Amino acid sequence: MSQYSQNQYAGAYPTPPVSTGPYVAPPPLGYPTNDTTHATVAPVETKSKGEAADGFLKGCLATMLACCVLDACIF
């Protein structure tokens, strides 16, 4: 058996804080709260829906053109 008693380790860990009620999970990240300590962030500049679709369409057309060129060169 050990020569040390359990009472000697009582000071190693602080006592847990007294609970004032049930645990409530914090809101998800990005969820607006009443906390005003954070600095306001400038709004992010976004593209309109047409501009984003235009880039996607150009990418698809470029890919199709590259496939056609490769197909013509190989066969």
Swiss-Prot record:
<dbReference type="Pfam" id="PF12734">
    <property type="entry name" value="CYSTM"/>
</dbReference>
<dbReference type="InterPro" id="IPR044850">
    <property type="entry name" value="WIH1-like"/>
</dbReference>
<keyword id="KW-0472">Membrane</keyword>
<keyword id="KW-1003">Cell membrane</keyword>
<keyword id="KW-0539">Nucleus</keyword>
<comment type="similarity">
    <text>Belongs to the CYSTM1 family.</text>
</comment>
<protein>
    <recommendedName>
        <fullName>Protein CYSTEINE-RICH TRANSMEMBRANE MODULE 5</fullName>
    </recommendedName>
</protein>
<comment type="subunit">
    <text>Heterodimers. Interacts with CYSTM7 and WIH1/CYSTM13.</text>
</comment>
<feature type="compositionally biased region" description="Pro residues">
    <location>
        <begin position="14"/>
        <end position="29"/>
    </location>
</feature>
<comment type="function">
    <text>Involved in resistance to abiotic stress.</text>
</comment>
<keyword id="KW-1133">Transmembrane helix</keyword>
<keyword id="KW-0812">Transmembrane</keyword>
<dbReference type="GO" id="GO:0005634">
    <property type="term" value="C:nucleus"/>
</dbReference>
<dbReference type="InterPro" id="IPR028144">
    <property type="entry name" value="CYSTM_dom"/>
</dbReference>
<feature type="transmembrane region" description="Helical">
    <location>
        <begin position="52"/>
        <end position="69"/>
    </location>
</feature>
<dbReference type="GO" id="GO:0005737">
    <property type="term" value="C:cytoplasm"/>
</dbReference>
<feature type="region of interest" description="Disordered">
    <location>
        <begin position="1"/>
        <end position="29"/>
    </location>
</feature>
<dbReference type="GO" id="GO:0005886">
    <property type="term" value="C:plasma membrane"/>
</dbReference>
<dbReference type="GO" id="GO:0071456">
    <property type="term" value="P:cellular response to hypoxia"/>
</dbReference>
